[in-house]
């Protein structure tokens, strides 16, 4: 049944959603898979670049816990020449809930919504087709199908980006749907049952997660380039989990750990890494920076990179000798020498 999600390649029906008009943008509801015996719809923001000559590349944007479909996120990609669709995969729209105490990250629901994220795979006791991860993955794949059906979009040049739990969804979808030209996951990953921290405590005895839903189980099938974006102080998704997951993927990988990035939705949008990665992959088919070789010579560590763009002449080594959960370790920055062969 999980593999069937990858067959949702036909464009879903969709309709305009109510709300104040925004120039160059559309609020929409797109049809998704049934839940509890009834049809569901997914709220989304859809936007195209204002200035374009012919079809443009595209990207599907997937929020994390406490998030929704973000108009601003779509606009940021539109400004860079991409068509974009940002989905709300928990049966919500982008209006904050008026109930006191629910202002922080809680959103008004709509009548066609599917399941909401409940705990850490907390609905694993439900039938597969009733679970949140099933519906979030389906909505993501269907959003890609919708975007690919638009004449303004290059159907074979559509990427995928997820933040936090949206990154988990992105990693899950990457292993099920081979159409994405690239995948960017901020924070979220697989190996949550064996990477330490709060997620391991919640999932180490969850047999369904360990044998079916952990993204790493099928990630070798994902041949598209992938970027994993995080930071050393990340408290939710262990860097051990992130590293393990990236090593399972079947295509070119790039990891970017940004000191003091912080965990949230805007933080990855405001960084250049995701945009540079997407542009490079669509231009060359590869990440712009790749590790070619690592070596140890006594107390000296050497890393060789292949890059298709100039590197900052300042280099530092960020390291730790601590044990335990990676987000709680003390990390040290040490100066490093950078020498290059011209790009």
Range-by-range predicted roles:
Residues 194-248:
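The feature captures the conserved acid-bearing segment of alpha/beta-hydrolase catalytic domains
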Residues 141-208:
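Primarily recognizes the serine-hydrolase "nucleophile elbow" in alpha/beta-hydrolase
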Residues 75-137, 189-201:
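Cap/lid segment of the alpha/beta-hydrolase catalytic domain
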């Amino acid at each position: 049944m999980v593999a069937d999600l990858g067959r949702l390649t036909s464009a879903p029906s969709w309709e305009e959603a109510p709300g104040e008009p925004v120039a160059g943008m559309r609020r929409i509801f797109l049809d998704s898979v049934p839940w509890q015996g009834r049809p569901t719809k997914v709220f989304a923001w859809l936007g195209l670049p204002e200035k374009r000559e012919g079809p443009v590349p595209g990207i599907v944007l997937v929020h994390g816990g406490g998030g929704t479909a973000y108009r601003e996120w779509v606009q940021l990609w539109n400004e860079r020449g991409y068509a974009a669709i940002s989905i709300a995969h928990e049966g919500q729209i982008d209006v904050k809930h008026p109930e006191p105490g629910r202002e922080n990250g809680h959103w008004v629901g709509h009548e066609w919504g599917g399941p909401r994220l409940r705990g850490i795979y907390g609905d694993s006791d439900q039938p597969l087709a009733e679970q949140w991860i099933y519906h979030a993955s389906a909505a993501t794949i269907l959003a890609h199908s919708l975007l690919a059906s638009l004449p303004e979009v290059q159907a074979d040049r559509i990427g995928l980006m997820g933040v936090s739990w949206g990154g988990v969804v992105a990693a899950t979808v990457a292993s099920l749907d081979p159409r994405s030209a690239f995948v960017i996951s901020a924070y979220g990953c697989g190996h949550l049952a064996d990477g330490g921290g709060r997620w391991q405590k919640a999932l180490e005895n969850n047999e369904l997660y360990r044998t079916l839903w952990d993204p790493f189980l099928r990630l070798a099938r994902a041949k598209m380039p992938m970027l994993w974006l995080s930071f050393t102080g990340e408290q939710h998704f262990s860097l051990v989990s992130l590293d393990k997951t990236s090593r399972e993927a079947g295509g070119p990988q790039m990891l970017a750990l940004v000191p003091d990035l912080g965990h949230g939705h805007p933080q990855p949008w405001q960084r250049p890494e995701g945009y540079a990665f997407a542009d490079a992959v669509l231009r060359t088919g590869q990440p712009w920076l790749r590790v070619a070789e690592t070596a140890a010579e006594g107390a000296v560590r050497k890393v060789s990179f292949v890059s298709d763009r100039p590197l900052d002449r300042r280099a530092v080594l960020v390291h730790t000798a601590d044990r335990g959960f990676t987000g709680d370790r003390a990390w040290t920055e040490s100066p490093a020498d950078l020498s290059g062969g011209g790009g």
